[in-house]
């Protein structure tokens, strides 16, 4: 194990729940505005999980006021307070980019039992 692996292992978080593409999650993000800090919740469907180790990221998509919003988060960043898994999605793909072209009920994901 070289020095870079030790640094990476020290910065990994262990409080991340199991989630994958298709799951609906609440990401509680720390937002700093001036001197004040607050928690902002970003709720949406995980459309991608990519990478491994400290460089792992995931992308969450939601529709806000009729406009699709996607946000990519590093999994092990200290800016995420915690991640809450609301529902487990039943999908057959690892990357759900096709959801970008679907509207309304067609963009719904079945819940896994």
From Swiss-Prot:
Keywords: Ribonucleoprotein, Ribosomal protein
Entry keyword Magnesium: no
A cellular component annotation (GO) from this entry: cytosolic large ribosomal subunit
GO biological process: translation
Keyword Lipoprotein attached: no
MF GO annotations: structural constituent of ribosome
InterPro entries reported for this sequence: Ribosomal_bL19, Ribosomal_bL19_CS, Ribosomal_bL19_sf, Translation_prot_SH3-like_sf
Residue ranges crossing the lipid bilayer per the database entry: none
Similarity remark: Belongs to the bacterial ribosomal protein bL19 family.
NCBIfam families the record matches: rplS_bact
Annotated function: This protein is located at the 30S-50S ribosomal subunit interface and may play a role in the structure and function of the aminoacyl-tRNA binding site.
HAMAP family the record matches: Ribosomal_bL19
Record protein name field: Large ribosomal subunit protein bL19
Native species: Corynebacterium kroppenstedtii (strain DSM 44385 / JCM 11950 / CIP 105744 / CCUG 35717)
């Amino acid at each position: 194990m070289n020095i870079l692996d030790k640094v990476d292992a020290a910065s990994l978080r262990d409080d991340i729940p199991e989630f994958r593409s298709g799951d609906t999650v609440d990401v509680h993000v720390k937002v700093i505005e001036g001197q004040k800090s607050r928690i902002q919740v970003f709720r949406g469907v995980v459309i991608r999980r990519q990478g491994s180790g400290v460089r792992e990221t995931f992308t969450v998509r939601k529709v806000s006021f009729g406009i699709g919003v996607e946000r990519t988060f590093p999994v092990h960043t200290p800016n995420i307070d915690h991640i809450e898994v609301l529902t487990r999605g039943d999908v057959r793909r690892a990357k759900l980019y096709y959801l970008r072209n679907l509207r309304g009920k067609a963009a719904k994901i079945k819940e896994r039992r």
